[in-house]
């Protein structure tokens, strides 16, 4: 489950119409949300608040033997008026990162006289004729800082600013206080990033003061309409290709990876429904009846190859699998996982009885009122947007790998509290991939077992924890 500050940052990106999915770093985000979810290992309590449309605060307290916590503040120049902030009304599907239907990227309108973000609703398609009619607000800027306590404390700071419709700059700072007995300046590292997104192409340029690391990430959406402000509503699928490269002149560190992604778009479901209602002699749609995503990533320097397949079998059920292979060490990894959403039955509120049912029965209007209710209910629940964002009360995630390491996570709403509870189980003799070369899929191994020496005693208990979130 996303933390409250991450949820507010996501709302900021939606308010400024910045597509976070159109990036090479999000190439395998869907599979990672189903296979690499984090299981809490202790008791944590989060208290958060969006006190004004521009300002948010969050406090975290955790304990298992050692009490620690954090204090976070966030400021946005863009008002987040339409962002649900109470934990009792926040849609759970926006906090839980699972399988989600990706929309085709919309190329932004390149108005070089642009000096601000228009303040109209982010869900509307931008028209070049409407830009001059919209109210103009200041350039979108976000400031976020988190202080982790107790000492030695760590400070995380984030700065984001849109400088054009297609460009955004980001600066992240991490500073750690030294030991109390050693008088030294706090260590710090700065990461600067320039993101340029034109819809069809997405490029990111990075620089880190840690070892003077330079980096680049790029993504190309093949066959996307490059017309500014025009959304490709007729495309049923999207094929994306990307790559990333890193180099450090100080440590002579070199990194390189490439990837492909194929995903279905919402138009595939509409095309399937229209083809099924047409004549039997029409050609069937080549796209499957359910949304799915395929990815392929390759790291040539380490010889790592990884493939993922994720599918949503129903609005409340999604599956994902990953296979990783290293051509140098001949080691492999297989991971499978799923998520199951559940909605508790709720009785509809009873209508007020005005005592005139007998008159309606005599006049024959009871059936007409029932037909109106049924048609209104079907029209409100049959839209793709309603199905995509249908609220669930809880979700269960399960993940298992080839060595029978199992993670089980439950996330749901209890009254006005958002609760996350999980357990991690697995044999203590698991050593696969811990001594081999690093691979893009090695992050799926349990953190508690990575690099640990093998033991002859089988220990199946790895961790258990609970996290509670309340926001106002």
Swiss-Prot record:
Q: Does the record bear RNA-binding in its keywords?
A: no
Segments of this protein annotated with the region Disordered: 433-454
Record-linked InterPro entries = Mdm10 (IPR027539)
Bilayer topology: Multi-pass membrane protein
Q: Which family does it belong to?
A: Belongs to the MDM10 family.
Q: Which PANTHER family match?
A: MITOCHONDRIAL DISTRIBUTION AND MORPHOLOGY PROTEIN 10 (PTHR28035:SF1)
User: What protein name does the entry list?
Assistant: Mitochondrial distribution and morphology protein 10
């Amino acid at each position: 489950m996303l933390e409250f500050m991450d949820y507010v940052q996501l709302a900021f990106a939606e308010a400024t119409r910045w597509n976070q999915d159109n990036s090479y770093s999000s190439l395998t985000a869907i599979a990672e949300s189903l296979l690499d979810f984090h299981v809490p290992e202790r008791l944590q309590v989060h208290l958060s608040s969006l006190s004004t449309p521009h300002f948010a605060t969050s406090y975290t307290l955790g304990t298992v033997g050692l009490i620690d916590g954090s204090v976070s503040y966030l400021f946005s120049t863009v008002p987040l008026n339409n962002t649900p902030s109470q934990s009792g009304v926040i849609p759970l599907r926006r906090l839980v990162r699972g399988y989600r239907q990706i929309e085709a990227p919309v190329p932004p309108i390149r108005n070089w006289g642009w000096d601000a973000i228009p303040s109209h609703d982010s869900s509307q398609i931008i028209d070049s004729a409407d830009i001059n009619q919209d109210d103009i607000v200041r350039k979108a800027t976000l400031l976020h800082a988190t202080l982790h306590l107790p000492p030695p404390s760590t400070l995380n700071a984030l700065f984001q600013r849109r400088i054009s419709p297609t460009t955004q700059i980001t600066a992240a700072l991490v500073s750690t206080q030294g030991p109390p007995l050693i008088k030294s300046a706090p260590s710090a590292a700065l990461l600067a990033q320039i993101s340029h997104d034109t819809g069809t192409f997405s490029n990111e340029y990075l620089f880190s003061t840690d070892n003077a690391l330079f980096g680049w990430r790029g993504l190309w959406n093949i066959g996307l309409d490059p017309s500014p402000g025009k959304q490709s509503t007729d495309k049923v699928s999207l094929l994306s290709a990307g790559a990333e490269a890193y180099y450090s002149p100080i440590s002579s560190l070199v990194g390189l990876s490439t990837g492909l992604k194929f995903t279905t778009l919402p138009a595939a479901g509409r095309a399937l429904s229209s083809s099924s209602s047409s004549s039997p002699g029409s050609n069937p749609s080549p796209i499957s009846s359910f949304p799915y995503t395929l990815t392929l990533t390759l790291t040539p320097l380490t010889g790592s190859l990884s493939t993922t397949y994720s599918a949503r079998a129903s609005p409340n059920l999604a599956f994902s699998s990953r296979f990783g292979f290293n051509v140098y060490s001949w080691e492999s990894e297989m991971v499978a996982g799923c998520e199951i959403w559940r909605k508790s039955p709720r009785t509809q509120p009873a209508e007020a009885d005005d005592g005139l049912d007998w008159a309606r029965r005599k006049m024959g209007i009871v059936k007409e009122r029932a037909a109106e209710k049924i048609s209104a209910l079907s029209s409100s629940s049959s839209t793709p947007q309603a199905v995509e964002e249908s609220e669930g009360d809880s979700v269960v995630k399960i993940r298992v790998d080839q060595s029978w390491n199992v993670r089980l996570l439950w996330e749901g709403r209890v009254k006005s509290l958002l609760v996350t509870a999980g357990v991690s189980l697995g044999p203590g003799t698991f050593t696969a991939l811990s001594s081999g070369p690093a691979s893009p899929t090695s992050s799926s191994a349990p953190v508690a077992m990575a690099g640990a020496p093998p033991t002859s005693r089988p220990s199946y208990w790895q961790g258990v924890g609970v996290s509670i979130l309340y926001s106002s």
